[in-house]
Design a protein with these regions (language model features):
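Short internal beta-strands
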Residues: 36-47, 165-168
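Active-site environment of divalent metal-dependent phosphoester hydrolases
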Residues: 16-21, 47-50, 68-71, 86-87, ...
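Active-site glycine- and acidic-residue-rich loops that bind
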Residues: 102-113, 140-152
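Metal-dependent catalytic neighborhoods of phosphoester/phosphodiester hydrolases
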Residues: 22-32, 49-53, 178-184
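Active-site metal-binding motif and surrounding structural segment of the metallo-beta-lactamase
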Residues: 2-42, 117-142
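Core dinuclear metal-dependent hydrolase active-site scaffold
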Residues: 1-6, 63-130
Length: 208
């Protein structure tokens, strides 16, 4: 982690859930983060909980508004896309490509149109980063099946919506540790299920 931080300029936090935001991490590595003048990018929120915590550690924080573009240099920029009260995605533009990271967001059609309007240069290819399985509680087996199917179909939907040149599925290797929760894993999508679905739908992808 220290080696990574010594070669890091920015840290993006999508939202405050513990699989995306670690209080322990920032407390433990705050001195290294400050020494390297790492800028933390986060969304403006009404409760300001994350904002106030990071400021209490005297870290360099840049708050972004919904659809606000933050430019790193002439060829690289990031645009934050809020969803609901807590979550966010981002659109990262480079010289040749757009990188759309959906994170944990579930955008409705109107929101997808709004994101699409942010893509100004139609000559650039778009790479999509997206979940491929559910990662939260579902009360019935039937609901688990539907949640798993929804995640796969959503990949196809977003790929078609944005005419993606490449899909990078990620962020779905969850594990419920308590014995009472073992059935929740029964219908989760694994890499083999995902690979078969993407190939059957002629979607170009990269599994890391």
């Amino acid at each position: 982690i220290v080696n990574t931080l010594n070669n890091t300029n920015y840290i993006f936090i999508s939202h405050e859930h513990p699989d995306h935001f670690s209080i322990k991490f920032f407390k433990e590595y705050k001195d290294i983060i400050k020494r390297n003048n790492i800028i933390i990018l986060f969304q403006e929120t009404e409760d300001k909980r994350v904002e106030n915590f990071l400021k209490s550690l005297e870290l360099n924080l840049k708050l972004l508004k919904h659809k606000e573009e933050f430019r790193f240099d002439p060829n690289n920029s990031i645009t934050l896309i809020k969803q609901g009260h807590i979550d966010s995605a981002f659109l990262y533009e480079t010289k040749n490509n757009y990188h759309l990271n959906i994170n944990d967001c579930n955008f409705i059609d109107n929101e997808l149109k709004e994101i699409k309007s942010l893509i100004k240069d139609k000559s650039k290819k778009l790479i999509l980063y997206i979940q491929f399985s559910y990662a939260s509680f579902r009360p019935t087996e039937e609901w688990l099946k539907k949640a798993a199917t929804y995640k796969l179909n959503n990949i196809k939907k977003l790929s078609n919506t944005f005419n993606c040149s490449l899909i990078v599925p990620y962020a779905s290797f969850f594990y419920f540790s308590h014995e009472e929760n073992q059935d929740l894993k029964k219908w989760s999508n694994n890499c083999n299920t995902l690979k078969k679905y993407l190939e059957n739908n002629n979607l170009r992808f990269c599994l890391l």
